[in-house]
Amino acid sequence: MRLRDLLQLQVHDLEVEVLTGIYSEETHLPQPLRISVTADIDMPERFDPDTPLGASKSYIDLKHAATTALPRDTHFTLIEAVAEHVCDTLFVSDARVRRVEVRIVKLAISEGGESIGITMVRHRG
């Protein structure tokens, strides 16, 4: 029996300004969000010392999906739509991506240091 191994890549606590929100005070100015992304990808049987970079995935791809790949001129009514966009970006960019988890914390509504937000988990087909 062959095990199905996955490599888990993570980028945590990226602070990003995104047009999001449903309240009038949120709809015209970008809101500060803290985004963390975890992606599970198919991996080779082994990573030997001379394994090429292409056998893995760059964590920069996760950072890109949560920052520069987010459209600056689009208003996301819900932060769930922001998470969906991050997931879609990673699934489209690499067929090896099997699962994406996106955690988003809305920094502007924290009153006592608490984390208020969502976590979305998507699996490829």
Where are these regions (language model features)?
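N-terminal, polar/charged subdomain of small-to-medium soluble alpha/beta proteins
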Residues: 1-125
